[in-house]
Amino acid sequence: MDLSAVRFDEKGLVPVVVQDARTGEVLTLAYANREALEETLRTRRSTFFSRSRQALWRKGETSGHTQEVVEVLLDCDGDAVVYRVLPQGPACHTGERTCFHRALLEGAKDLGFVPRQVYATITARLRPPPE
């Protein structure tokens, strides 16, 4: 696990975009320090660094809404990471599926029928529920 290409900021953090691996939907933006990133890669569970608590934050530790990490990507500059995940429940502490549920742009276009999302939903429902 070579993290030498990751450019952590002056506080030792890197932003992490969390994306649903099935739908491509952005679920949240969080931060990871080296320890959180190492734990994520080792356990394949989303782990972050809580800036408010100054401690590791393991997604789902209290809510049960875990995220299985299927891929971790580093951007071209090395200063941002994407966790592609299979979420078990909502990503947001409010109970919303995504933390990005408040529209700032009025009258945003409805994309209507999105075959990729329909396929992902059907595929997910065909799988047996987690034990």
What do these predicted regions represent?
Residues 2-13, 19-22, 26-27, 32-131:
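C-terminal binding/interaction regions
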